[in-house]
Amino acid sequence: EWGHFFDEIQVQLEECNGSDCSVATTTLEVELLARGDCPEDFTGWFKNFVLDSVDLVTDVGPPVRLPNEAGGYFRVTQGQNDLDVRLPIDATLTTGSRFLHPGTSGVSEIQYGLDFRTKCEGLRFGIGHLADLVDEISELFTTEPTEDTKVVDLPPLEFQAGDLLATAIGFRIDGNSFVGFGVNDDFLRMPTSKEPLFHNAVCYYGFFSPDIASDLLSKTVHQTYEPVEEGVCPPTTTTP
Protein backbone atom coordinates (compact mmCIF):
# COMPACT_ATOMS: atom_id res chain seq x y z
CA GLU A 1 0.00 0.00 0.00
CA TRP A 2 1.22 3.50 -0.89
CA GLY A 3 3.06 5.10 1.99
CA HIS A 4 3.40 1.88 3.99
CA PHE A 5 6.71 0.06 3.79
CA PHE A 6 9.28 -1.87 5.81
CA ASP A 7 13.07 -1.94 5.75
CA GLU A 8 13.64 -5.51 6.89
CA ILE A 9 12.05 -8.97 6.82
CA GLN A 10 12.43 -11.37 9.72
CA VAL A 11 12.17 -15.11 8.99
CA GLN A 12 11.80 -17.67 11.78
CA LEU A 13 12.43 -21.38 11.20
CA GLU A 14 11.35 -23.82 13.87
CA GLU A 15 12.94 -27.27 13.94
CA CYS A 16 11.67 -29.96 16.27
CA ASN A 17 13.07 -33.32 17.28
CA GLY A 18 10.26 -34.86 19.25
CA SER A 19 9.31 -32.39 21.96
CA ASP A 20 12.66 -30.61 21.72
CA CYS A 21 12.29 -27.59 19.43
CA SER A 22 14.61 -24.79 18.45
CA VAL A 23 13.96 -21.60 16.52
CA ALA A 24 16.42 -19.94 14.17
CA THR A 25 15.79 -16.31 13.22
CA THR A 26 17.17 -14.60 10.14
CA THR A 27 16.79 -10.89 9.42
CA LEU A 28 16.96 -9.71 5.83
CA GLU A 29 17.45 -6.04 5.04
CA VAL A 30 15.25 -4.68 2.27
CA GLU A 31 16.30 -1.91 -0.08
CA LEU A 32 13.68 0.82 0.04
CA LEU A 33 12.66 2.19 -3.34
CA ALA A 34 10.14 5.01 -3.42
CA ARG A 35 7.37 4.84 -5.96
CA GLY A 36 5.81 7.74 -7.80
CA ASP A 37 7.19 10.86 -9.44
CA CYS A 38 10.48 11.32 -7.58
CA PRO A 39 13.37 13.39 -8.95
CA GLU A 40 17.00 12.34 -8.71
CA ASP A 41 17.76 15.66 -7.05
CA PHE A 42 15.23 17.39 -4.79
CA THR A 43 17.00 20.75 -4.92
CA GLY A 44 14.43 23.32 -6.02
CA TRP A 45 11.71 20.67 -6.21
CA PHE A 46 9.11 23.06 -4.77
CA LYS A 47 7.86 25.26 -7.58
CA ASN A 48 7.08 28.28 -5.43
CA PHE A 49 7.20 29.58 -1.87
CA VAL A 50 4.19 29.20 0.43
CA LEU A 51 3.73 32.98 0.69
CA ASP A 52 3.61 35.35 -2.28
CA SER A 53 7.21 36.40 -1.62
CA VAL A 54 10.01 35.15 0.59
CA ASP A 55 10.84 38.82 1.15
CA LEU A 56 7.84 38.95 3.51
CA VAL A 57 9.59 36.60 5.94
CA THR A 58 11.42 38.25 8.85
CA ASP A 59 12.64 35.12 10.64
CA VAL A 60 12.53 31.36 10.24
CA GLY A 61 12.13 28.63 12.82
CA PRO A 62 13.93 25.39 11.91
CA PRO A 63 12.32 21.94 12.07
CA VAL A 64 12.02 20.31 15.51
CA ARG A 65 12.70 23.58 17.28
CA LEU A 66 10.59 22.27 20.17
CA PRO A 67 10.55 18.70 21.59
CA ASN A 68 6.88 18.12 20.66
CA GLU A 69 6.76 19.98 17.36
CA ALA A 70 8.28 18.60 14.17
CA GLY A 71 7.71 21.57 11.91
CA GLY A 72 9.19 25.04 11.79
CA TYR A 73 7.69 28.40 10.90
CA PHE A 74 7.97 31.44 8.67
CA ARG A 75 7.31 34.66 10.56
CA VAL A 76 6.34 37.97 8.96
CA THR A 77 5.94 41.53 10.24
CA GLN A 78 3.74 41.89 13.33
CA GLY A 79 0.10 42.43 12.36
CA GLN A 80 0.54 41.27 8.77
CA ASN A 81 -1.98 38.45 9.14
CA ASP A 82 -3.88 38.91 5.90
CA LEU A 83 -1.59 37.05 3.54
CA ASP A 84 -2.26 34.41 0.91
CA VAL A 85 -0.85 30.94 1.47
CA ARG A 86 -0.24 28.76 -1.57
CA LEU A 87 0.77 25.19 -2.25
CA PRO A 88 4.50 24.82 -3.06
CA ILE A 89 4.06 21.73 -5.25
CA ASP A 90 1.36 19.45 -6.68
CA ALA A 91 -0.05 17.44 -3.78
CA THR A 92 -3.09 15.74 -2.29
CA LEU A 93 -4.74 16.94 0.91
CA THR A 94 -5.00 13.98 3.31
CA THR A 95 -5.59 15.15 6.89
CA GLY A 96 -6.08 18.34 8.85
CA SER A 97 -7.00 19.92 12.14
CA ARG A 98 -9.17 22.80 13.33
CA PHE A 99 -8.82 23.89 16.92
CA LEU A 100 -9.02 26.80 19.34
CA HIS A 101 -5.64 28.15 20.38
CA PRO A 102 -5.01 31.02 22.82
CA GLY A 103 -2.53 33.55 21.53
CA THR A 104 -0.48 35.83 23.73
CA SER A 105 -3.66 37.86 24.26
CA GLY A 106 -5.18 34.91 26.10
CA VAL A 107 -8.16 34.91 23.75
CA SER A 108 -8.61 31.71 21.74
CA GLU A 109 -8.75 31.91 17.97
CA ILE A 110 -9.44 29.23 15.37
CA GLN A 111 -6.30 27.75 13.83
CA TYR A 112 -6.09 25.27 10.97
CA GLY A 113 -3.44 22.75 10.02
CA LEU A 114 -3.33 20.94 6.67
CA ASP A 115 -1.30 17.87 5.69
CA PHE A 116 -0.46 16.92 2.13
CA ARG A 117 0.96 13.89 0.33
CA THR A 118 3.18 14.55 -2.67
CA LYS A 119 3.41 12.44 -5.82
CA CYS A 120 6.72 11.06 -4.56
CA GLU A 121 6.16 8.28 -2.04
CA GLY A 122 7.29 9.03 1.47
CA LEU A 123 7.37 12.81 1.10
CA ARG A 124 4.69 14.68 3.01
CA PHE A 125 4.40 18.24 4.24
CA GLY A 126 2.20 20.23 6.56
CA ILE A 127 1.16 23.88 6.67
CA GLY A 128 -0.15 25.18 9.98
CA HIS A 129 -1.45 28.18 11.90
CA LEU A 130 -3.77 29.15 9.08
CA ALA A 131 -6.54 31.52 10.14
CA ASP A 132 -8.88 31.67 7.12
CA LEU A 133 -9.07 28.81 4.63
CA VAL A 134 -10.54 28.93 1.16
CA ASP A 135 -14.15 27.68 1.12
CA GLU A 136 -13.28 24.47 -0.72
CA ILE A 137 -11.17 23.35 2.23
CA SER A 138 -12.96 24.96 5.18
CA GLU A 139 -16.18 23.15 4.20
CA LEU A 140 -14.45 19.83 4.91
CA PHE A 141 -14.35 20.62 8.64
CA THR A 142 -17.85 19.85 9.88
CA THR A 143 -17.46 19.85 13.67
CA GLU A 144 -17.19 22.78 16.04
CA PRO A 145 -13.58 23.63 16.96
CA THR A 146 -12.34 22.82 20.45
CA GLU A 147 -8.95 23.00 22.13
CA ASP A 148 -8.31 19.43 20.94
CA THR A 149 -5.64 19.54 18.21
CA LYS A 150 -6.45 16.03 16.99
CA VAL A 151 -5.74 15.46 13.31
CA VAL A 152 -8.65 14.03 11.29
CA ASP A 153 -8.84 12.34 7.91
CA LEU A 154 -10.20 14.53 5.13
CA PRO A 155 -11.61 13.61 1.73
CA PRO A 156 -8.59 13.54 -0.59
CA LEU A 157 -8.42 16.69 -2.69
CA GLU A 158 -5.79 17.19 -5.36
CA PHE A 159 -4.15 20.59 -5.70
CA GLN A 160 -1.61 22.11 -8.05
CA ALA A 161 1.45 24.15 -7.17
CA GLY A 162 0.40 27.75 -6.57
CA ASP A 163 -3.19 26.93 -5.63
CA LEU A 164 -4.59 29.21 -2.93
CA LEU A 165 -5.11 27.48 0.44
CA ALA A 166 -5.71 30.32 2.89
CA THR A 167 -6.00 34.10 3.03
CA ALA A 168 -4.88 34.76 6.61
CA ILE A 169 -2.32 33.36 9.04
CA GLY A 170 -1.49 33.40 12.74
CA PHE A 171 -3.41 35.27 15.42
CA ARG A 172 -5.25 38.44 14.48
CA ILE A 173 -6.03 39.68 17.98
CA ASP A 174 -2.42 40.06 19.07
CA GLY A 175 -0.99 40.39 15.57
CA ASN A 176 1.24 37.32 15.91
CA SER A 177 1.81 36.67 12.21
CA PHE A 178 3.42 33.43 11.09
CA VAL A 179 2.70 30.22 9.22
CA GLY A 180 3.83 26.78 10.33
CA PHE A 181 5.65 24.59 7.82
CA GLY A 182 7.22 21.16 7.95
CA VAL A 183 8.33 18.40 5.58
CA ASN A 184 8.70 14.70 6.39
CA ASP A 185 10.66 12.24 4.28
CA ASP A 186 10.19 8.61 5.29
CA PHE A 187 13.07 7.60 2.99
CA LEU A 188 15.47 10.17 4.51
CA ARG A 189 16.66 11.42 1.13
CA MET A 190 17.29 14.95 2.39
CA PRO A 191 19.07 16.09 5.58
CA THR A 192 16.88 15.55 8.62
CA SER A 193 16.73 16.92 12.15
CA LYS A 194 18.28 13.76 13.67
CA GLU A 195 15.78 14.09 16.52
CA PRO A 196 14.72 10.54 17.58
CA LEU A 197 11.04 11.45 17.96
CA PHE A 198 10.97 13.13 14.56
CA HIS A 199 13.76 11.35 12.71
CA ASN A 200 12.12 12.01 9.34
CA ALA A 201 11.58 15.76 9.84
CA VAL A 202 13.45 17.30 6.93
CA CYS A 203 15.55 20.46 6.85
CA TYR A 204 13.22 21.85 4.22
CA TYR A 205 15.44 24.62 2.85
CA GLY A 206 16.81 22.62 -0.08
CA PHE A 207 13.38 21.87 -1.50
CA PHE A 208 13.05 25.53 -2.48
CA SER A 209 15.07 27.26 -5.19
CA PRO A 210 18.66 28.10 -4.20
CA ASP A 211 17.82 31.81 -3.87
CA ILE A 212 14.86 31.15 -1.57
CA ALA A 213 16.82 28.56 0.43
CA SER A 214 19.67 31.00 0.96
CA ASP A 215 17.28 33.72 2.09
CA LEU A 216 15.53 31.39 4.54
CA LEU A 217 18.83 30.17 5.97
CA SER A 218 19.98 33.74 6.51
CA LYS A 219 16.82 34.39 8.54
CA THR A 220 16.90 31.18 10.59
CA VAL A 221 16.96 31.80 14.31
CA HIS A 222 17.58 29.32 17.14
CA GLN A 223 16.12 30.64 20.38
CA THR A 224 18.24 29.78 23.40
CA TYR A 225 15.28 28.09 25.08
CA GLU A 226 14.78 25.77 22.15
CA PRO A 227 16.68 22.49 22.77
CA VAL A 228 17.77 22.04 19.17
CA GLU A 229 21.23 20.92 18.20
CA GLU A 230 22.77 23.75 16.25
CA GLY A 231 24.27 22.70 12.96
CA VAL A 232 21.52 20.18 12.17
CA CYS A 233 19.54 22.75 10.25
CA PRO A 234 22.25 25.41 10.31
CA PRO A 235 21.25 28.65 12.03
CA THR A 236 22.94 31.94 11.41
CA THR A 237 21.98 33.66 14.64
CA THR A 238 21.04 32.79 18.19
CA THR A 239 18.78 35.09 20.16
CA PRO A 240 17.96 35.13 23.88
Enumerate the predicted regions with their spans.
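Short alpha-helix capping/helix-loop boundary micro-motifs
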Residues: 77-80, 149-153
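Short, compositionally biased
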Residues: 175-197
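Conserved binding-pocket/active-site segment within a compact domain
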Residues: 161-169, 186-193
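Zn2+-dependent peptidoglycan hydrolase active-site motif and core
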Residues: 88-152, 177-178, 182
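Surface-exposed, short loops/turns at beta-strand junctions within beta-sandwich domains
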Residues: 2-7
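Hydrophobic beta-strand segments within extracellular beta-sandwich modules
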Residues: 9-11
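Surface-exposed, glycine-biased beta-strand/turn segments
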Residues: 29-121, 158-164, 170, 200-201, ...
